[in-house]
Amino acid sequence: MLKADGVFQGGGVKATAFTGAICRLEKEGMMWQRLAGTSAGAIIAAFLAVGYRGKEIKKIMCDLDYEKVGNITAIKKFPLAKKSLGLILEKGIFSTVYIEKYLEEMFKNKGKTKFKHISLNGQSPLKIIASDVTNKRLLILPDDIKKYGMDPMELEISKAVTMSISIPFFFTPVKLKYMGKEAYIVDGGITSNYPIWIFDVKDVPRWPTFGFKLGNGGDDFNRTIENKDFISYIVDVVETTIDSYDESYLRDKDKIRTISIPALGVKTTEFNISLETKEKLYKEGYEKADEF
C-alpha cells in the first residue's frame, strides 16, 4: 500500500485527464492521506476526499452537463448588451447554481456533505484554494472561512468547491457577508492555481506529496485565430492569467514530484469538447502516471 498526499492544479474541463492518472496510481494501491486542489482540481480532490475512486470520478465528470455549466459558444451569439448586463449586475456571465447542486448531490451519495464529515478532531484532510478579490487574499478552505464568522466544520464541501471554480467574469462570484461587509470569492487560480506547497513541512514528511499538473505542450499555438468580441477577450485574459500564474515559480523539487499531463490544446472553458476528446485526456493522464 502506498501513502501520499495529492495536489491537483486547476484547469476546467481539462481536469478529466487527472482521472486517468488517478486510476493508474490506484492500480499500485495508492491510498490518499490528504488532498488539495484549485478550481477543477478542487473538484477532483473533493471527490477523492469523500470516497470516490478514479473510475467513478471519470464517469461523474463525463455525466456532468457542461452546457449547463457554461456554454461559451452560445454566449458569443448573445448581444453585447445582454452579456455586459450580466457582468455589471452579477459580476459574471454564468451562474454556478447548477454545478453546486450537482456536486452537492454527488457528495450526498457518499453521506459526506460538510467538512466535519471527512475531518478528525477538527482537522480536514481536504484543502480547497479560493481567492477573496475584495480583500485581495488567498483562502485555504475550510480553515479560512473563520475570517467570515463561519465554522469551518459546518462549511458545505460543495460551497467551498464552488468558490474555487468561479472563474472571474465567466462565473458569478460567491458572496460572503460578515460584520456588514460583503466579499467576493472567486477562482483559486487567481492566487495559486497549483498549490503544490500546501502540505510542505520543514522536517522529513511522513509520506510524499504528488502533484498533478496540466501542460499545453504547445498545441494552443496551432489554434485558429478568430475575431473575438469583448467578453470573449476578457475570458481569454483571465484564463491566461490563471493558467500561467504558478508556471514561473515551479521549482526543481516541485517538478520531480509532479505528474505533468498534456492538455491537448483544450482550453479551460471549452466545455463543449467531445466524449472522444475526454477519452484522449483520460488516456494521457493514465500514460503519464505510468511513466512517473
Q: Model-found features: residue ranges?
A:
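Patatin-like phospholipase
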Residues: 1-38, 46-292
